Regions:
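All-alpha helical catalytic cores of prenyl diphosphate-utilizing isoprenoid enzymes
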Residues: 32-36, 50-59, 135-147, 153-260
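Conserved N-terminal diphosphate/IPP-binding helix and adjacent helical/loop segment
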Residues: 1-86, 91, 95-96, 100-130, ...
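Membrane-spanning helices that line or support transport/gating and their immediate boundary helices
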Residues: 95-98, 147, 151
Length: 261
């Protein structure tokens, strides 16, 4: 029995439960951070602030992918922890994305690099405040990425199911990062000037930075945690047919996963 309403897959109750798992993990990490030094407290505070809120789409697709495939639900804490770990991965990408895009805000707050740039100015720190903000944003993004892996691998889930899901998580991390590289390349104008090449590149950006990363891989991870990869491997596409476009990948997968054989 799942404690959340499938007709409202990203309900406030679901989002609050994901947030609780994230905060619990950060509370545990606080002991490690405090032992290293008080200078790191602002970084941990920023991790709390920037992982708060959000739609929690990736955790939701992971959770409900599991629900669609599982004969019996796994222990709720383990499933929620594994699903919530994807939010750390997402926020890591957002922190770095904001830095590359020179964005000033994120989720109603100053972006991480702007936040620490301002903190440097208030403290009258040495050197350029902008550089300090950029440096801390890179490091916080890296830390969030490492925490995502740590939170996932420490989830109280059967070892064989974590092992089955791990290659999918590896692919998710690689694809979103490569999708970001494609995005930067597309904006640079270095990928060729003909419209067909440009359209192909944009399609791959959408595929790997959005559709696969947001929907397909999280769903697949949930299915793997359900121990149902054998059934589902033949059902989802590894990539979208060119004639259908990248966004169709997620649609095909969701349609196929709704009626398992």
């Amino acid at each position: 029995m799942y404690p959340f309403d499938p007709s409202s897959p990203v309900s406030a109750d679901f989002r609050d439960s994901v947030s609780a798992r994230i905060l619990s993990f950060l509370d545990d990490e606080k002991r490690v951070i405090d032992a290293i030094g008080a200078e790191l407290s602002p970084v941990l505070d920023a991790a709390r602030d920037y992982t708060a809120g959000g739609k929690r789409l990736r955790p939701a697709f992971c959770y409900w992918g599991h629900a669609a495939a599982a004969d019996q639900p796994i222990e709720p804490t383990g499933l929620l922890q594994a699903a919530a770990s994807l939010e750390f991965l997402h926020v890591s990408a957002l922190v770095h994305d904001d830095l590359m895009d020179h964005s000033d805000t994120r989720r109603g707050l100053p972006s991480v690099h702007r936040h620490f740039e301002a903190a440097h100015g208030i403290a009258h720190g040495d050197g350029p405040a902008e550089q300090f903000g950029c440096d801390i944003a890179i490091l916080l993004g890296d830390l969030l990425l490492m925490w995502s892996s740590q939170m996932f691998t420490s989830a109280p889930v059967k070892a064989d199911r974590l092992a089955a899901a791990t290659p999918l998580l590896d692919a998710m991390r690689t694809e979103v990062t490569c999708g970001q590289v494609l995005d930067v390349t597309s904006q640079s104008g270095m990928a060729g000037s003909d419209s067909e090449s440009a359209l192909d590149l944009v399609g791959r950006v959408v595929e790997y930075k959005c559709a696969s990363y947001t929907v397909v891989r999280p769903c697949q991870i949930g299915v793997a945690l359900a121990g149902a990869l054998t059934v589902y491997n033949r059902r989802w596409p590894t990539s979208a047919p060119p004639s259908d476009g990248p966004s169709n990948t997620a649609t095909i997968f969701l349609a196929s996963s709704a009626t398992p054989s």
